[in-house]
């Protein structure tokens, strides 16, 4: 568990990790279980290439959520590479969604769905940045 000097759980860190775990579990579940529906709803089209890439991304998200769950029990010491990886994934995906919005080119999907995903990924990116700066001496 993540502790401060008095050996109490730092609530903000527990909140941020919990949000990130739920975020990755939600998207991995959507990508792995509802691959077809998720691709149609969020990408706008479906074929086997999209399904394969969606499943790979779901596996990556599931792995990251499991890693964060393990960190809840083992601690965050020396886990900076994992948190930088999580931040980069969230940030790059959110920037990609914002690019679709700013250029008004949703492709086969709609701007509302892309906007929701952009906001979710941006929010989680900001939380991860906050977590990294809040714990930089432990990472």
Question: Model-found features: residue ranges?
Answer:
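Cytosolic juxtamembrane helix and N-cap/initiation of the first transmembrane helix
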Residues: 2-24, 139
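Hydrophobic transmembrane helix segments
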Residues: 19-59
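Non-cytosolic membrane-interface motifs at loop->transmembrane helix junctions
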Residues: 42-49, 106-118
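Core segments of alpha-helical transmembrane spans in multipass integral membrane proteins
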Residues: 50-72, 88-95
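Alpha-helical transmembrane segments of polytopic membrane proteins
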Residues: 51-60, 112-122
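Hydrophobic alpha-helical membrane segments
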Residues: 82-101, 118-125
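Membrane-helix boundary connector in multi-pass membrane proteins
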Residues: 95-115, 134
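Membrane-water interface at the C-terminal end of transmembrane alpha helices
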Residues: 120-139
